[in-house]
Structure formats: structure tokens, C-alpha cells
């Protein structure tokens, strides 16, 4: 018989407050532990049929084969921002996982959801809840609360532990190890970049209609700090979670005139070669110096919070200062990462595809 307990959000918000994300030369804070109300409630018997309404946590469960094989549904964003060639090569059965229970308006279609016969549903935060208790099965909020909204290591370790605890699986520490390895490896280079006061723009969207940047208290802001860079948008006022990703004008970007630009959902090539009408990117220092880079896309876009994002600070330093971290080092570290994290020997052609400029 399926567990029918709804895990209330207040239990998840009772986690201790984590300190502010440090500069690149400091370690990350310890991850929050799943509260007892989560850890104590595991599904009895065999592993369940798992549904995940969001995208970022799916990458974490991909690293746990015992859990992954029971996923039957995931939000469409998990596939929209992925390199399907990589996903299908790594997980040949990925096609069995459906996103059809999410409507075009991104609301849950309860009839389609129930057709999946889920035993447990994971969601992230109030915006993804969508009255999931109607399904009559165990639901788990993966929002650790507090400042973890811009602490990627703490967030992913929390997800990894919560998946293991609620599914009755042994805990692993893959993501903690991965983040600690990267932060240790980049420490001297990030410190040198920090001393140079390198000014960076983390460009979330640049589709010709709007420019959206990562302001303070965002993952993007944290990634830049890890790499030793100053976020040019770090002092902008924000309001609420959605406000952390800020619409700005081309005039504002020109006034910032960053040294380097990282493009997440958009094309670095278009920025470099004048492919976006009405935007004067060619006047910027970063464009003139060829310091505009798209974040890699593999299992998901590394620039969000993907299963590969612990490699992102390494990538950022490689692109800005290849004399510190060479292309060969990045390539080898990425190959090793896929093997360690997913037991996946990524082919050379796909590894090149992941790291290619878009």
C-alpha cells in the first residue's frame, strides 16, 4: 500500500540557516540535512514509481542508477535544455520517461499524472506544488529553504540525501565530493582572478526581445564568485525569487562594459558576430576581446543547476584564463567526471559537442 502522507513545506523550512556563499577562495557551507519528517518516511517494499515535476533535481537522480530506473515522469524542462545526443547515449532507455503530465501552460495535468501510477512525487518549492496532494501519494518538496537558493553545493547535496532517504537507498556523497574537488582545484587561479577585479556578466537570456541577467543571491552570482569574478549586476536591487533574474537594457550593459560574458540561454556566437538585431554588443570590451562564452550543455545546461554544474567554475576559468586551466585539462576533467558520476564513458564526439561554443 502506498504511503499517502503529504510532507508539509514548513517541515522543510525548519532547516538551520546556512551562511552566505563565500568568495572563490573559501569553502562552501555544509549542506542542510533532510529533516526527520522526510528521512523517517520511506516507501515500503520495492522501489516506487517516481515522478519529478522539475528539471534540476532530475540530474541528481541520474547519478543514482537504483533510483533512476524507477523514474517514470519528469518535467519537460529537463529535456528542453539538454543535449539529447548525450542523454540518449548515456541512458538508452531515456525515452520511456514522459513529460506528458505537464500541460503547455506548465500546469500539472492530474489525469495524465495519475495515469503514470506514481508512488512518490518530488517537486521544488511552492510554485511547483500545484495541489499535488490530489494524487493521494507521498509528495516531497526538494526546496531546502533559506539561502540554499543560491548555494549550489548545499542544494545538490540536500537533493542527493533526500532522494536516498525517502527511497530507502544508501546515501552517497558524489555531489559533495565533486564540488569540493573543483573548489580545491581552482582555488589559486580564482584567487588570482579575484585580485585582478575581473568584471563579469552572467547573461541568463538574450533572445533579441529581452536581456535577463543574474543579480545578487542567484546561482549565477555564486558561480562567478567561485571563479573569482565580480558580478557587474551584483548590486542591483531585487525583489522576491523571480526578481533575482533581472531584465536590463542594452544601455545598462554598455555602461557596465564587462570584461567577460557568460551566456546561458542564448547564443554567444550571435553576440560575438552581431547576430542579434537592435543590440550593440560589438561596442563592449568583452566582445572586442573575444571573451564571450556559452555555458556547456550536456545532461542539462551547466549554467543553471545541472548534474555537471560543479565543473562550471573550472570551465569559466578555462575560458577566461586558458593559461591557468588548459583546454586539455578541462576536456580530461569533464571526461573523468562523467565516468565517476554516471559510470558513463562519453565518446569524444559528444564531449566535444558538450563543450562547444553555441
Go through each PLM region and give its residues.
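Alpha-helical, coiled-coil/dimerization segments enriched in small aliphatic residues
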Residues: 217-244
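A short, structured surface patch at a secondary-structure boundary
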Residues: 51-54, 58-115, 120, 125, ...
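Short helices/loops that flank or line small-molecule/ion binding pockets
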Residues: 107-117, 135, 247-257
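Active-site/pore-lining binding-face segments in mid-to-C-terminal subdomains
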Residues: 259-320
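Bacterial N-terminal signal peptides
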Residues: 8-20
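Structural recognition of the beta-strand scaffold that forms the well-ordered cores
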Residues: 51-53, 72-75, 120-124, 139-142, ...
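Extracytoplasmic substrate-binding proteins
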Residues: 30, 40, 128-212, 294-357
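Signal peptide processing junction and immediate N-terminal pro/mature segment
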Residues: 20-29
